[in-house]
Amino acid sequence: MKKAILMMTFGSPEEITFEGVADFFTNIRRGVRPQDHEIQTLYDNYVRIGGTPLQKITRQEVALVEARLGNEYSVYFANKFSSPFIPDVIGQMEADGIEQCICLILEPHYSFYSVMGYEKFLESKQIQFLVIKDWYQEEALLNYWVDEIAKILKEEVKQDSCKVIFSAHSVPIFALDFGDPYIDQIFENSKLVAEKLGLSSEQYTNTWQSESDIGIPWIKPDVLEYLREQTEHPDHYIFVPISFISEHIEVLFDNDVECYDLCQEFGVNYHRPPMPNTDSRLIDALVNTVRVNENQEFKEFLPEEETFDELVPSDETKNILAESEDLQMPEFVKKLIEKKGRENVKMPYLIKKMFEKAGKLPKE
């Protein structure tokens, strides 16, 4: 039986031009082209950081995993929002005769909002899939962050006052209503690293970053808002974007430009450990993740639904409008509506608020 590993990531523009960024942004918005001023802002951000190394780094990560596991698995690489696209790579895998595939998403934490965006593409009459849900607890990855933060504390902070700011990509606040495990995983991940470093609860905090402006509330505090709200600052901040493993725009701009600029304004020293990128400790974590999971059941993939079935709707949410295609809703919500029918999907309060904002609630 021919087996494969499919390593997947978010993607990035294929070329740093206005139209190249526009194409990528349109893919993120599910085929709806953003307004020109939105595209211009994102394009300017890419120019500010000199482009993005994400695709180069990811291909190097894939090659390093293949060097370790290539005798047992064919290793493939795909993006969610840029070439090579996941459906195209699955087509190539089918042509290569692959029958079983371990899906390794290059995001250590599991989120309905983001990870299910990968899962929806896993369709094949030939291939059975095994999706690794999360791998943030891998000891090698934890040790990477501990070692790199400790190095900054020892060599640069020394005896000065300091606070470690763990940040993670934010998610819409209605993820709380769905019981999304992502938020708790981020807190647990930060605590595990902090405990290994011997940090007290006053020496570190959790923030969120990189939220999208799609007209709905996101998990707070945003890292920039957190910095602005502090009445006193330490001598040093160490920013740890713990939900990412590779350098890309949400680290190189959101942290290294925006957070850095605020630190300059407040007279605080800015630090960020290098991202794992191609470090051997990250590769160890990825390889071990495959080893730990490879004997689990492979199956035709279907998105999980049981999380939603446990929700009890209030009277207010029972008559929400059936049509949702034009709303910026997570794909897993749309897919659930399509599969089970609008009348059978139990939506929590904040989903209702999304419909209200869009003026889509039916009249009483």
Curated annotation (Swiss-Prot):
InterPro entries reported in the protein's UniProt record: Ferrochelatase, Ferrochelatase_AS, Ferrochelatase_C, Ferrochelatase_N
EC number: 4.99.1.9
Disulfide bonds, paired cysteine numbers: none
Keyword annotations of the record: Cytoplasm, Heme biosynthesis, Iron, Lyase, Metal-binding, Porphyrin biosynthesis
UniProt superkingdom: Bacteria
An individual GO BP term: heme biosynthetic process
Residues the entry annotates as binding Fe(2+): H169, E250
Pathway: Porphyrin-containing compound metabolism; protoheme biosynthesis
Cell compartments where the protein resides: Cytoplasm
SUPFAM superfamilies: Chelatase
Binding annotation for Fe-coproporphyrin III: R29, Y118
UniProt catalytic activity: Fe-coproporphyrin III + 2 H(+) = coproporphyrin III + Fe(2+)
Function: Involved in coproporphyrin-dependent heme b biosynthesis. Catalyzes the insertion of ferrous iron into coproporphyrin III to form Fe-coproporphyrin III.
Similarity annotation: Belongs to the ferrochelatase family.
HAMAP family named among the record's database cross-references: Ferrochelatase (MF_00323)
Protein name as annotated: Coproporphyrin III ferrochelatase
Gene for this chain: cpfC
